[in-house]
C-alpha cells in the first residue's frame, strides 16, 4: 500500500495548524484488527517530532503572517513560530509591518537568528538554506 512519508505528514500537520484547521488521519485496522505496521511507524516518528516541536503546534493559532509557499506561522501570545517547510534561500522576508521583534532564534537549537528590519517587515537571515523537514524559528514580539 502507498503510505505518506513522515515529512509529508508533518507538513500536513503544520499547514493545518498554520491555517487554523484540524488534521484527521484515517488509519484503519487490518482484517486481524491490528493497525498496519507502517502506520504505527509513521505515528511514532510524528510523535518524536512532536516531542521537540509540539509547543509550536499545541494551543496555537495561525500566526500573523499568512501562509506562503515557503510555509506557515503559528502563534501563542507574543510568540510567533515560523515553520519553514520549503525555502530555497538563506533569508526569509516576513511582512510584519511595524510589529517590533524583540528576538528571534532557532526553536530546536536556541541559536540566535539575525533579524534585519526593512520596509514592510523584517528579513530573517538563516545563514544557510534550510534542509530540515520543518525549520522552526521562534520570534518574540
Predicted feature descriptions by range:
Residues 1-141:
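Mature catalytic domains of secreted/periplasmic carbohydrate-active enzymes
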Amino acid at each position: 500500500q502507498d503510505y505518506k512519508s513522515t515529512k509529508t505528514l508533518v507538513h500536513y500537520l503544520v499547514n493545518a495548524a498554520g491555517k487554523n484547521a484540524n488534521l484527521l488521519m484515517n488509519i484503519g485496522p487490518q482484517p486481524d484488527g491490528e493497525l498496519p505496521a507502517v502506520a504505527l511507524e509513521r505515528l511514532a516518528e510524528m510523535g518524536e517530532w512532536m516531542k521537540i516541536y509540539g509547543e509550536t503546534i499545541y494551543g496555537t493559532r495561525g500566526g500573523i503572517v499568512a501562509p506562503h509557499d515557503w510555509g506557515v506561522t503559528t502563534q501563542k501570545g507574543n510568540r510567533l513560530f515560523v515553520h519553514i517547510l520549503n525555502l530555497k534561500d538563506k533569508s526569509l522576508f516576513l511582512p510584519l509591518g511595524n510589529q517590533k521583534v524583540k528576538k528571534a532564534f532557532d526553536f530546536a537549537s536556541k541559536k540566535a537568528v539575525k533579524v534585519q528590519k526593512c520596509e514592510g517587515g523584517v528579513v530573517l537571515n538563516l545563514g544557510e538554506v534550510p534542509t530540515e523537514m520543518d525549520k522552526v524559528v521562534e520570534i518574540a514580539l
